[in-house]
Amino acid sequence: QSTNDLIKACGRELVRLWVEICGSVSWGRTALRMTLSEKCCQVGCIRKDIARLC
């Protein structure tokens, strides 16, 4: 799967993706993650966006 694929994921699906990309979910930078979560849900994001927050 390409790192540029646009992913529209919300809730559990987003968490599942996060674990797949990062290996685990630690919610340290909460504000930034919430912003990204909303973006991923509404307009989509790419795997690189999520990987940056690992």
Curated annotation (Swiss-Prot):
One of its GO terms (cellular component) is extracellular region. PROSITE patterns: INSULIN (PS00262). The modification Pyrrolidone carboxylic acid is found at Q1. InterPro entries: Insulin-like (IPR016179), Insulin-like_sf (IPR036438), Insulin_CS (IPR022353), Nem_insulin-like_b-type (IPR003235), Repro_Hormone_Insulin-like (IPR051042). The keyword Manganese does not apply. Its main location: secreted. Disulfide bonds join C10-C41, C22-C54, C40-C45. GO terms for molecular function: hormone activity. Keywords: Cleavage on pair of basic residues, Disulfide bond, Hormone, Pyrrolidone carboxylic acid, Secreted. Belongs to the insulin family. Heterodimer of a B chain and an A chain linked by two disulfide bonds. Relaxin is an ovarian hormone that acts with estrogen to produce dilatation of the birth canal in many mammals. This is Relaxin.
